[in-house]
């Protein structure tokens, strides 16, 4: 969800079926609303007036309207709506009571709040306006109106004057519930940071998460609330429905998926004894029935001792499994038999075992390990091949020493890349709340510097990784080869791992060519490429098999190494920063060189800073903790992408 203010009104409101029959329309019942539509805009029913053009930034005061009429003839309501402060002062000084409601039971403070007139609100408060005055058909406070309209700056101002967001309107909704229903997530975050509980029930006993799951079709704001630690198994007061019950009744597939991922119980029963699956059958939704049944079956399996053991030791077991599978394929190909039918049957059996294991045992977490454990298996069989095939033909101690150093470097830098914290940005709940309040009140609650997934302030050059579900300082990319992120703290180790891996592959090419030249005489000029491949296959199928996956690893590792060194040395950028800049360049009328960025200090200095080279004091690298480097304001971090939920 984009946290930038837009023009569109949200028609979700409070319409639609409710878990407990609470579902009235959302209208104030008054006839005029002026000012910007706001973030998640709200337009009262029966609107007939003209909207004053509003700002795109919800933290700024609206522009004054260039109305053709002379404001000296306006009544105080119209002057308030259009921001004519001097006319308002004139009428108040003439004796108008700022606490007096109009014929629709709406006070001047309501009109100032819904139109985001900060200076007029300040003036009315100084003249004795009641901050939490209830008014309108929905019996709402000015704060409720500002929340519905999406005016974050007005919400902040009213709360500074003592407005109480925990008060309920005529429909029973408190401030946080309204922010969620109108999908004003910055306001919801601010209210929670100021002390509103994420599971605060409305007067009908429903939490914000229940309302989101029931009334707003789509992943948000359900996902947002779960990230704020909303309870997925809370129940309402009327029917004891959980958020999952509400989502199923509303047919909200996205919310159901998110709630299940968050661990919502599929066995919880409401007052009528119905589970979520029972309700899915009642609403005749085959998709929801399938989703809920699959999750229920998976959770039953997850309680088995076998799967618990697999999840506990998944890295080791998956590595062993990959080593066995890669070795089994090669061993079958290397069998001394002329029967390709037998080899085909054995290979088919191996594929069947893999398929069975993936269906019965492999979870999403286990499947994500396949590339990294496949790489580990490949390196293992490279070493075995060197020892059993190449070592007897290579008596040179220097070559053996260099190979040993190389394989040690590969293992060392690979482990360091995997085990070193890439720079995960961490913050306590109190720090998160403090940052939200500070950024909101400074007008900087913006996705470029505030992560809407982690709910915390992002350091400069940090990005949110959706695979790791964390913000990573100076993130380069998420690598499938280490099953983790490459960031500020493990990036040098990863680059050195690529260097060592490329040298290992070169040694394997050297050993393969040397072995073939001695044991497999080839006549390429006479037999052609297919004849040569046939000869190699007949000479040593295993070696040709190993050569193929060595070639594969050489291809991606060499390309990735060249790109990494180019970005580090010549640009001073990470992969994600380069991608963001290239995307923005396409929108610019004139091309701008990627080298023109504040992090590019020249080739030598870039390399010194990246690898932290000192050379006995000859070099002085820049030492920075990128998890603590914060931009000073909007626009300072030109390389960050908005990680909006």
Curated annotation (Swiss-Prot):
It is a multi-pass membrane protein. The keyword NADP does not apply. It is found in: Golgi apparatus membrane; Cytoplasmic vesicle membrane. Keywords: ANK repeat, Cytoplasmic vesicle, Golgi apparatus, Membrane, Repeat, Transmembrane, Transmembrane helix. Gene3D superfamilies: Ankyrin repeat-containing domain (1.25.40.20). Residues 34-43 have a biased composition (Gly residues). Residues 1-73 are annotated as: Disordered. Residues 7-20 have a biased composition (Basic and acidic residues). Pfam families: Ank_2 (PF12796), DHHC (PF01529). Residues 23-33 have a biased composition (Basic residues). It comes from the Eukaryota. One of its GO terms (cellular component) is cytoplasmic vesicle membrane. One of its GO terms (biological process) is BMP signaling pathway. ANK repeats lie at residues 104-133, 138-167, 171-200, 204-234, 239-268. Residues 1-314, 358-369, 416-492, 564-645 are cytoplasmic. Residues 449-499 form the DHHC domain. GO terms for molecular function: palmitoyltransferase activity. The chain crosses the membrane at residues 315-335, 337-357, 370-390, 395-415, 493-513, 543-563. Residues 336, 391-394, 514-542 are lumenal. Signal peptide: none annotated. The keyword Cytoplasm does not apply. Belongs to the DHHC palmitoyltransferase family. AKR/ZDHHC17 subfamily. The DHHC domain is required for palmitoyltransferase activity. Putative palmitoyltransferase that could catalyze the addition of palmitate onto various protein substrates. This is Putative palmitoyltransferase ZDHHC13. It comes from Danio rerio.
């Amino acid at each position: 969800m984009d946290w930038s203010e837009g023009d569109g009104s949200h028609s979700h409101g409070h319409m639609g079926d409710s878990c407990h029959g609470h579902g009235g329309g959302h209208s104030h019942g008054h006839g005029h609303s002026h000012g910007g539509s706001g973030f998640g805009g709200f337009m009262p029913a029966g609107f007939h007036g003209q909207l004053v053009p509003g700002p795109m930034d919800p933290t700024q005061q609206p522009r004054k309207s260039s109305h053709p009429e002379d404001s000296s003839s306006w009544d105080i309501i119209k002057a308030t709506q259009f921001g004519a402060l001097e006319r308002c002062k004139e009428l108040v000084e003439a004796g108008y009571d700022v606490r007096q409601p109009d014929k629709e039971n709406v006070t001047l403070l309501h009109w100032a709040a819904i139109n985001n007139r900060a200076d007029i609100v300040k003036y009315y408060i100084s003249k004795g306006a009641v901050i939490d005055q209830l008014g309108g058909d929905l019996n709402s406070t000015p704060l409720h109106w500002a929340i519905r309209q999406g005016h974050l700056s007005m919400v902040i101002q009213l709360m500074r004057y003592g407005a109480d967001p925990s008060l309920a309107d005529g429909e029973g909704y408190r401030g946080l519930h309204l922010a969620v229903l109108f999908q004003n997530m910055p306001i919801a975050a601010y209210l929670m940071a100021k002390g509103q509980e994420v599971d605060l029930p409305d007067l009908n006993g429903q939490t914000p998460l229940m309302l989101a799951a029931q009334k707003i079709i789509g992943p948000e704001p359900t996902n947002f609330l779960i990230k704020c630690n909303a309870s997925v198994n809370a129940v309402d007061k009327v029917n004891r429905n959980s958020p999952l019950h509400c989502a199923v009744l509303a047919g909200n597939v996205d919310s159901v998926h998110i709630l299940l991922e968050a661990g919502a119980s599929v066995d919880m029963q409401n007052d009528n004894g119905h589970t979520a699956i029972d309700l899915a059958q009642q609403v005749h939704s085959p998709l929801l029935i399938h989703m809920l049944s699959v999750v229920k079956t998976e959770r039953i399996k997850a309680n088995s001792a076998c799967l618990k053991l697999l999840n506990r030791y998944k890295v080791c077991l998956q590595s062993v499994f990959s080593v066995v599978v890669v070795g089994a394929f090669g061993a079958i190909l290397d069998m001394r038999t002329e029967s390709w039918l037998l080899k085909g049957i054995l290979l088919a059996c191996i594929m069947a075992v893999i398929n069975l294991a993936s269906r019965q045992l492999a979870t999403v977490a286990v499947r994500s390990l396949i590339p990294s454990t496949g790489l580990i298996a490949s390196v293992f069989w490279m070493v075995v091949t060197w020892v059993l095939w190449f070592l007897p033909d290579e008596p040179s101690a220097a070559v053996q020493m260099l190979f040993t150093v190389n394989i040690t470097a590969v293992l060392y830098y690979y482990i360091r890349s995997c085990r070193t914290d890439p720079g995960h940005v961490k913050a306590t709940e109190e720090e998160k709340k403090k940052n939200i309040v500070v950024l909101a009140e400074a007008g900087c609650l913006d996705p470029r510097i505030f992560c809407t997934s982690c709910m915390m302030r992002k350091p400069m050059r940090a990005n949110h990784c959706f695979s790791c579900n964390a913000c990573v300082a100076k993130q380069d990319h998420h690598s499938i080869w280490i099953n983790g992120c490459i960031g500020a703290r493990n990036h040098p180790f990863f680059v050195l791992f690529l260097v060592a891996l490329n040298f290992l592959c070169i040694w394997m090419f050297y050993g393969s060519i040397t072995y073939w030249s001695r044991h497999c005489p080839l006549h390429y000029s006479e037999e052609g490429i297919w004849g040569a491949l046939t000869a190699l296959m007949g000479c040593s199928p295993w070696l040709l098999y190993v050569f193929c996956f060595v070639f594969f690893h050489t291809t991606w590792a060499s390309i990735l190494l060249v790109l990494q060194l180019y970005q580090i040395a010549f640009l001073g950028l990470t992969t994600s920063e380069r991608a963001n800049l290239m995307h923005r360049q396409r929108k610019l009328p004139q091309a701008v060189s990627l080298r023109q960025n504040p992090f590019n200090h020249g080739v030598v200095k870039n390399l010194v800073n990246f690898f932290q080279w000192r050379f006995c004091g000859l070099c002085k690298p820049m030492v920075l903790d990128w998890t603590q480097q914060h931009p000073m304001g909007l626009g300072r971090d030109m390389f960050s992408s908005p990680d909006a939920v």
